[in-house]
Amino acid sequence: MKLAPRCGRRALLAALLLLPVAAVFAQDQSAQKPEAATDTHQTADTTKPGPEQEFLGKRSGEYTRTVKFVAQPNADANASTGTSKMSVALGGRFIVEENNDTVFGRPVSGTRIYGFNNITKQYEAVWMYTGSTAMIFLTGTSSDGGKTIDFNGMTQNLRGGKVPLHATMRQIDDNQFVVTLMSTGADGKEAAFQETTYTRKK
């Protein structure tokens, strides 16, 4: 007859001992909830297109391209011409360029993808063309809202060595922009070697 009260006292003692642990656990859980909510909110925001993507998207359309190898003599006289179509992709998150040129009498086609990474706060680009099986990856920044973007990346020479590449994308107006490619020579100085002018078709 005395066992039940003794068991009851043990259960009560165990419950009292667990109260502080339960309180701490509850406080910890409540402290984590706002952080989790904040993380979810931030994740949702970074997945949506913002002003940077919107500005890139304004370049969508069809263009004529004039490609000049500015490091060569008579660059204007030897300029190559072609076309480019730029399209917004994946709900405004990226812009995809498909271009076709005739360079020194040979057809050359390329694909370029541009975007802005909301997490790293950097512009990103991937370039591919029929003159290579390699993909060129570039990251860039802008100090004027995307009107001028400075890209940097690496290319490869025929021996497989890495060569730094600097590219700028400069908006002239709503209907024209220029992409300039630069590299560093053996003397350590950077110089432009190619300039492509895009003019929107009317």
Question: Can you annotate each of these PLM segments?
Answer:
Residues 2-13:
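Bacterial N-terminal signal peptides that target proteins for export
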Residues 2-4, 25-30:
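N-terminal acidic, proline/glycine-rich, low-complexity intrinsically disordered segments
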Residues 13-22:
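Bacterial N-terminal signal peptides
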Residues 27-202:
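Hydrophobic small-molecule pocket/channel-lining residues, especially in calycin-type beta-barrels
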Residues 2-3, 20, 173:
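Helix-centric, low-specificity signal for extended rod-like, repetitive segments
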